[in-house]
Amino acid sequence: MAEKLPPEVQAQLAKFQQLKDQLDRLLLEKSTIENELREINKVLEELSVLNADATIYKIVGNLLVKSDKTSVEKELNDRKELLELRSRTYQKQESILRKQLEDLQAKINDMLSKYYPQGGQTGIKA
């Protein structure tokens, strides 16, 4: 395929690449959130075995600050709830982006088959 692609195919390929980049960024953010959720769950699990009057320290910036178990658990549960909401939102966005990519891939392959009917091997894969 040494010849230049038609402008409409180039435009669709550019759109495809933008969607792919958007999906990659979304997956990276989703992974970061999932890692933080795992960490919060581990901390909450450890806190659950401590006595209510146990001495707890949390990191605030560059400082270790003494805190009570109840407030730390509340803070962690609030953060966990927020992250779970974000995770569900990202899952929905991921599903939408994957569908858009799939549809656009089919459209591009269809366009390419019209321009290069005997090519057989032309087309893109996600």
From Swiss-Prot:
Compartment(s) where it occurs, according to its Swiss-Prot or TrEMBL record: Cytoplasm
Single GO molecular function: unfolded protein binding
Main location: cytoplasm
GO biological process, one term: protein folding
GO cellular component: cytoplasm; prefoldin complex
Pfam family, one: Prefoldin_2
Keywords on record: Chaperone, Cytoplasm
SUPFAM superfamilies assigned: Prefoldin (SSF46579)
CDD domains: Prefoldin_beta_GimC
Subunit (UniProt): Heterohexamer of two alpha and four beta subunits.
Protein purpose: Molecular chaperone capable of stabilizing a range of proteins. Seems to fulfill an ATP-independent, HSP70-like function in archaeal de novo protein folding.
Family: Belongs to the prefoldin subunit beta family.
Protein's name in the database: Prefoldin subunit beta
Gene name of the encoded protein: pfdB
